[in-house]
Amino acid sequence: MAGYALPSTFRSITPPCEENLYRSIHAQLEAFAEPPSPPVITLQNLDDPCASATFGEIMYSTYPRFGAQGLITSCLRRNLQHVEGLGFLAFTNGALAAHGYCHIILMNVPVTVDGIIIYPSDLSHGDWNGVTTIPHQIASEVPQVCHEIAEAETIILNYLKQPTVTATGFNAARQECGEALSQLGRRLRVEYVPATRVGRGP
């Protein structure tokens, strides 16, 4: 999963101030059409602990239909047996069999999800290993860098395939790998400047 963060804050433990629970979802879907795209839905749950499941079959079907690439959230989900085959990647904090008063508080604002600060328009990536953000300045280099990291790690892996190994030999291979990775890090290090996008309410 890769796309541009559309981060929002969220609650479900109490009803919203307005009667229409779906107004904020309407605004969210409209924002999908704004650049940059495609969007990654990013929600910080302000309820502690989580009071209800935020996402089930309906939302898992709605978001990709409007162009979203995935979901990153500290909220919970439900309908696991139904959403598994939908192909929409979602990174959540678990599951809960409960409905709630789901509504967005603020949209397009910086959020924190499981220790990751995510700004509006951050390039977000997720796979089986988890979620991260990628600075725009180095995004075009990521495919090549992944290859170089894997190549550096083969120094250790190749040593371990030798008929005889020693702690001294392993340490030498580890140091060689570490130096290769350090050189790569020095080459890529940039000052991270969040993409600017004005925050707004739903």
Regions found by a protein language model. Give the residues of each.
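Feature captures the catalytic cores and cofactor-binding loops of soluble hydro-lyases/lyases
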Residues: 1-120, 134-202
